[in-house]
Amino acid sequence: MDSRDTGETDQSKYKGIRRRKWGKWVSEIRVPGTRQRLWLGSFSTAEGAAVAHDVAFYCLHRPSSLDDESFNFPHLLTTSLASNISPKSIQKAASDAGMAVDAGFHGAVSGSGGCEERSSMANMEEEDKLSISVYDYLEDDLV
């Protein structure tokens, strides 16, 4: 049965992501002041794609606070991200953060007998911030 038959839509409640017709969630973001887009990746869950978008948005726009409504999961971000990092480093950090979230969902779903992804996101929100660091992806001359 198609999701359109059940009344569900492929539109997400998260910012900066979309769903492909075959079910994967993707995220990309425009680099401010340019026509360039950063491809952040293809993810199994909407939450993974949303976290990737959040990391890239934060690195590119450097908002003054994490209370900005531009974020999907502001509580998962760390404010200790470096400034002046390359778009490629931002892309890698965002993609890895999204994949880490996806991996957490797959572990929670497969280990719990098929519980809903939303409940695993609730568990994730109770844990500490993402353990991934943008510093892991900085080019040596920027550190």
From Swiss-Prot:
The keyword Acyltransferase does not apply. GO terms for biological process: ethylene-activated signaling pathway. Pfam families: AP2. It comes from the Eukaryota. It is found in: Nucleus. InterPro entries: AP2/ERF_dom, AP2/ERF_dom_sf, AP2/ERF_TF_ERF_subfamily, DNA-bd_dom_sf. Keywords: Activator, DNA-binding, Ethylene signaling pathway, Nucleus, Transcription, Transcription regulation. Residues 13-74 bind DNA. One of its GO terms (cellular component) is nucleus. One of its GO terms (molecular function) is DNA-binding transcription factor activity. SUPFAM superfamilies: DNA-binding domain (SSF54171). Belongs to the AP2/ERF transcription factor family. ERF subfamily. Probably acts as a transcriptional activator. Binds to the GCC-box pathogenesis-related promoter element. May be involved in the regulation of gene expression by stress factors and by components of stress signal transduction pathways. This is Ethylene-responsive transcription factor ERF020. It comes from Arabidopsis thaliana (Mouse-ear cress).
